[in-house]
Amino acid sequence: MAQSIIRTTKAPALALTPTQFSQQHFDLLNQQLRIYFNTVDAFTSTLSTADGGSSLSIPHIAASDSTDQIATGNDIPTVINFNTLDSGLGWTLNAPGSATAGFSGVYTIRYSLQFVNTANAIHNATVWLKVNNVDLANSATSFSIPARKSVGVPSYVAGYSEATFEINSGDEIELYWATDLAGDPTTPTDGVYIYHDTAQTVPYARPAIPSALGSITFVSRL
């Protein structure tokens, strides 16, 4: 279904009134006002429909990451990477994964992290937000990842959470995580890490599994 386009309105530069009545000037003035009010009507009627919100452009960002993410060490805070901008307006994605706000407002951030545990015991991971490299109060969430099923068969948990908070233009937002046992599939070292996988065709076709998915959406002005 095609989306309606909102066209902004601008007051016309009305023709100057002559010292004496002029039918030509009167007709021109009516024409200018008619065009202007038609534009205003089109603007308000588009917004007042059931799908009026679909015509608006709202600040947002959505990003993902296509790599395994390894904690720096046991119980050491580590930044979460996002290497792919999936969609964005009014935000900038910076390497290795922070996002900078272009507009002030109240925003909601949502994320999903594909945790893997290759160890033979349950282990925990905690995720939280930083704004301008300062921990955001009440933004942490803990996840418990079960012990592996067997050697070479890890357990998986999709760690999801969200938070709503105020952001000023220019603020830099980051996700951090830590785990009590940092795993590394390249060593290999048993423990917890954030897992990714490419798309597959067998035994069934499916898309790639990002290690991290995140989005920030505008809720309200400050």
Cite the ranges covered by each PLM segment.
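Alpha-helical interaction segments
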Residues: 16, 23-27, 81, 101
